[in-house]
């Protein structure tokens, strides 16, 4: 994801959760989810291991999300549409939602479509509740929706690509 980890870790350490969350969400479209289920490969190569133990980056991200995400999300105002282009994103998994979020933040209309009734794909349908609470998924979905991303869920999987191309860029 290429996040600004040193910045948000420092802010969480100072108890500045709102500021830390703003840094996180600038690059990460699913902060509550990744704060819960990231497999934290970085811990095994952390330079802090030379001194004591690795920095618990995932836990710090989750702390910021739990303490600041609802407030941040409530204050979101969708970006002004600055493009006459309209994007259709096929697939409402985490990657599709991230794509839509960043397009929408940058002033383009974005519509996420999926044959399933609920977004987030594997996150929603495969990962069990004891690993990832539905509340964390809800937080990230609300973040995407509040930014102005539209959803068309439960679509017929036999739709016409040609018809789609006429309506979207």
List the predicted regions and their residue ranges:
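Ferredoxin-type iron-sulfur electron-transfer modules and their immediate structural context
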Residues: 1-86
